[in-house]
Amino acid sequence: MSDTLPGTTLPDDNHDRPWWGLPCTVTPCFGARLVQEGNRLHYLADRAGIRGLFSDADAYHLDQAFPLLMKQLELMLTSGELNPRHQHTVTLYAKGLTCKADTLSSCDYVYLAVYPTPEMKN
């Protein structure tokens, strides 16, 4: 994962490239289309992208949290909470990040969007 993060602190809205992840209006946002093989997920760097400007701390947290998020999504595939035949968005939280994921009823892919968890205002 870390080989996909260089330059995340440089402005790049990626409007000239396809967005592979789950549709997301929050910026910054990391999006990816993961390949599903049974209950396993595979990350392909050419099917991922970043919109907006991640802080160095958030980019570091994304690098740390991504393997954990992948494992949690695989467990959700195993339990049936994430189902390739039914559209259903799941939300995970790790290291100050929010991850939304959904199969979008596609039998071979899981789409995700990861972004810094917004702070709650009192």
Swiss-Prot record:
GO process annotations (BP): negative regulation of cell killing; positive regulation of cytoskeleton organization
A GO molecular function held by the record: cytoskeletal protein binding
Subcellular location as annotated: Cytoplasm
Xref: Pfam families: CbeA_antitoxin
UniProt keyword terms in alphabetical order: Cytoplasm, Magnesium, Metal-binding, Toxin-antitoxin system
Cofactor(s) it depends on: Mg(2+)
Deletion phenotype: Single deletion has no effect on expression of cognate toxin cbtA i.e. the probable operon is not autoregulatory. Deletion of 3 type IV antitoxin genes (cbeA, yafW, yfjZ) has no effect on cell growth.
Cofactor binding note from Swiss-Prot or TrEMBL: Binds 1 Mg(2+) ion per subunit.
Binding of Mg(2+), residues: H86, H88, D102
GO cellular component, one term: cytoplasm
Induction trigger: Expressed in mid-log phase at considerably lower levels than antitoxin relB.
Domain of life: Bacteria
Note: Encoded in prophage CP4-44.
Family (UniProt): Belongs to the CbeA/YafW/YfjZ antitoxin family.
Function: Antitoxin component of a type IV toxin-antitoxin (TA) system. Antitoxin that counteracts the effect of its cognate toxin CbtA (YeeV). It does not bind to the toxin but instead binds to MreB and FtsZ (the toxin targets), enhancing their polymerization by forming higher-order bundles; it is probably retained in the MreB and FtsZ filament bundles. The mechanism has been proposed to require intergenic DNA, in cis, between the cbeA (yeeU) and cbta (yeeV) genes. The intergenic region was not found to be necessary in another study.
Assembly with partners or alone: Homodimer. Interacts with polymerized and monomeric MreB and polymerized FtsZ.
Protein name: Cytoskeleton bundling-enhancing antitoxin CbeA
Protein's gene: cbeA
